[in-house]
Amino acid sequence: MAVETLSPDWEFDRVDDGSQKIHAEVQLKNYGKFLEEYTSQLRRIEDALDDSIGDVWDFNLDPIALKLLPYEQSSLLELIKTENKVLNKVITVYAALCCEIKKLKYEAETKFYNGLLFYGEGATDASMVEGDCQIQMGRFISFLQELSCFVTRCYEVVMNVVHQLAALYISNKIAPKIIETTGVHFQTMYEHLGELLTVLLTLDEIIDNHITLKDHWTMYKRLLKSVHHNPSKFGIQEEKLKPFEKFLLKLEGQLLDGMIFQACIEQQFDSLNGGVSVSKNSTFAEEFAHSIRSIFANVEAKLGEPSEIDQRDKYVGICGLFVLHFQIFRTIDKKFYKSLLDICKKVPAITLTANIIWFPDNFLIQKIPAAAKLLDRKSLQAIKIHRDTFLQQKAQSLTKDVQSYYVFVSSWMMKMESILSKEQRMDKFAEDLTNRCNVFIQGFLYAYSISTIIKTTMNLYMSMQKPMTKTSVKALCRLVELLKAIEHMFYRRSMVVADSVSHITQHLQHQALHSISVAKKRVISDKKYSEQRLDVLSALVLAENTLNGPSTKQRRLIVSLALSVGTQMKTFKDEELFPLQVVMKKLDLISELRERVQTQCDCCFLYWHRAVFPIYLDDVYENAVDAARLHYMFSALRDCVPAMMHARHLESYEILLDCYDKEIMEILNEHLLDKLCKEIEKDLRLSVHTHLKLDDRNPFKVGMKDLALFFSLNPIRFFNRFIDIRAYVTHYLDKTFYNLTTVALHDWATYSEMRNLATQRYGLVMTEAHLPSQTLEQGLDVLEIMRNIHIFVSRYLYNLNNQIFIERTSNNKHLNTINIRHIANSIRTHGTGIMNTTVNFTYQFLKKKFYIFSQFMYDEHIKSRLIKDIRFFREIKDQNDHKYPFDRAEKFNRGIRKLGVTPEGQSYLDQFRQLISQIGNAMGYVRMIRSGGLHCSSNAIRFVPDLEDIVNFEELVKEEGLAEETLKAARHLDSVLSDHTRNSAEGTEYFKMLVDVFAPEFRRPKNIHLRNFYIIVPPLTLNFVEHSISCKEKLNKKNKIGAAFTDDGFAMGVAYILKLLDQYREFDSLHWFQSVREKYLKEIRAVAKQQNVQSASQDEKLLQTMNLTQKRLDVYLQEFELLYFSLSSARIFFRADKTAAEENQEKKEKEEETKTSNGDLSDSTVSADPVVK
């Protein structure tokens, strides 16, 4: 009742159709607006959370994969539903067979091709041990068994396809037809059958080209033979061996003899038990031939053209089908056979997979020798000659091709960016989708063309064993980069492409549905009934229903099969049919866009041509301008990995991957990274040492590479890691600079400068070495001096006042100096323990020197002379005002030369002076060590606010009840602080130690001969002054050999030895320096007096001589004065104010005081005890 009452009120809706449509559009627009606003809101949230989130995907980081390929949930029986049951069955059977073929093809391409191709890889000849070949083959048998089962299944499918097609096209006039087949051509079925034949043919080619596989197989058979002779030795039962050998023979016959394809086409297609007749079925033979021609016509038109998609693969299928047709029906179309061979002029070779290249002419001649005889030899020979010329032409045009494709691909990328960035307008939505569809397909076509050029050229070179020029290699590598650039482009814009693809497929489906509905209306409008018309209508309805849904492979296959039936009886006009076919092709491409692009851009074949990689890297290094292309090449090299995972001849495919990884990384290191490291290091070194003018670095003459571009590269992804060129070079430089600085610490400043330069010039963030540095004036290290103290004291001169050592002579431009800061830095480097070690070394050195000193003093000539001098002085001292006569010292100095001189002209006294200087230098070094130690300690302690009141950190930590680790740290800090405080406050009395250790020995009665030392000091000083003046004169004359301006080691040595012998008073009693002063002053006065006399007589020559004499006397007096001051200063270090007896007395008094204070302390403790109790 309710319906009846309502219906009149709703009657007006029939008229109001237009308004309802407008209303729906408004709602749709509002919904669209809402979605847009919501999207932009989400985008704003994303931007606020993270800058890196965006529409552009990074090829190196793909944690999320976006798969666009729709997955069919319904079964074929559910999809193929029409009222026409017979048609349903036909389409279902054919669709099921096509799906089966696709699955077999996929399994072959992923599992079996790769398993066979990679057999024997991953082990070099050097690493192969005897027996490895047999072990590999042993592991591989199970794979061959699986391949055998696969091939058998392929044979069954081929047989079934032929039977199903033969059953439909019956030549028997009496037998009932399943459906009317006039004008029905299931071209799709033949294409799929061709694909399956291609798989079998490819397996044959792979095995035929695989020498390693065949060799290992032969070795394995030999192994079995030897096992067969003595099975018990190998622990194998004999009854198990025979079936295994039979099985191997079966495998060999089926797979390894190159008969996989041949055995398939030689099957018995005619059913023996009166089933389907094939070879006698003329209708089927005609249909078969017609379909081959139709496919060929389509293929021939596109082959070698820019719009080529998969025509090459189809051509291989056509050749397979042609051979199968000949095998079954034994008829041959000579004209068509010639047409097939003519294609070889366009396409001389086809890559089946990886590095397997196939020559159609060889195949057709070999498989149909009867037809080959009909052709003249010349034309067959011409094909082979053409192949050579094709390769030559290709090599010449490669560079040109690269340039062209560079422009094409670049402009295509710009189109992609612009079309995908442009906002879609609703009023031009369809047009926009068409544009996008065309740009996507154009990208795929470029990928196909480039991929074909690379594979064909590289594999032809390899197959014909012709050498490639470097130019060709570089050009091909550039094409590989372009190929990966196309793939990257699609990947980068994955989000937008995914969005567009779904819209484009819907748009194309809509176009196809429109064409089909027009044809369907035409069929329905024709009122004549026939079964054929019913089939056509059912097929069109099926196509319509299937198109109404996702564009899956199964649905597109069903539409294709349905249209094979639906296009008969001129249901479509010619101008309608072609656009429909174009739309269906586009739908195929767009629906599988991602997969097809991936397949075309897959560079797995590079594994077999990896010999080009070193040449490529050399080119990248030489032309650093576009270093970023490395990303593309590594992306291409990475493509081999999925294929390698199907290797079955090793314990695990990981071994093969590791081997490949190692090989590529070694090549990369050798041809790029190591060269780059060396070049950068060289550049930094030369830049830092420009003042040395080592070589011409004028960029206009030598040329210049901007290697900094390598460091702006993002890390390159390879396997499961990133190769960071910047990090690699930085690490190399850090390691090199660190190691070289540890070897020569004084070079730290140079390496520090090089680090700064690396940061400025190349942007490398270097790590500080944190090695204890030295001062900028690069001096010797304490450790070095300590180990070579005997060399040091002879090569360096000491300056007492400035406390500095200066190198005596050097071949360098500058002389080395060593001062307190050097020593302090060295002590900081090695720790304060080095100070005591140094003093110990000095003690060892002094011991040796004092032994020589003693020998000299003991010498008869010297000793007798010295005793004479002592006696003489005692006799004349009262007359001579207690002064040692200058003449006596001069006489000694001259007289000693009579004892002999060295080849260098040195007397014994000169050598003795040098010995004392060396002893003094050693003592000067000890003094410097002590000063350096204090300097180092005070530097370390300078941040402690009050040395008198240092906080005890351990106690503070205990009070706060902090963790054990903190307590330990506080204890360490306290210990360090107390050490530093003690070191800076005290400083060890090394001089006192060195006096105390030698003095007792020197003062013993057995060394009485040393007591004469004080009397040799006057002639020694005289000798020293003469030597010193001579050195300074050389300095004035710029004669660097023997030049010097200081040698306070002598004064230091004299002061030290006098202290050891306790002879300060004896030496002072000589009043030697007073005697010298008097002598020179007297002479100066005499000269001055003479000058006054001579100035009246105006004898210029005589005046000049007198001036020179006066100057000489002044210089000598000045030198003696300097020596006197130095000796007085040196004596202070050894407490010259006290004699040995006075020092001993002082020592005793101190000891007694200590004992007394200790005694008082013990008494007070005893008296305190009772109180405590």
From Swiss-Prot:
Residues modified to Phosphothreonine: T1154
InterPro entries, alphabetized: WASH-4_N, WASH-7_C, WASH-7_central, WASH7
Modified residues (N-acetylalanine): A2
Entry's Gene Ontology cellular component terms: early endosome membrane; endosome; nucleoplasm; WASH complex
UniProt KW Protein transport keyword: yes
Biased composition (Polar residues): 1157-1167
Region Sufficient for interaction with WASHC5, residue ranges: 705-1173
Composition bias, Basic and acidic residues: 1142-1155
Recorded family membership: Belongs to the SWIP family.
Disease: Intellectual developmental disorder, autosomal recessive 43: A disorder characterized by significantly below average general intellectual functioning associated with impairments in adaptive behavior and manifested during the developmental period.
Protein name, UniProt field: WASH complex subunit 4
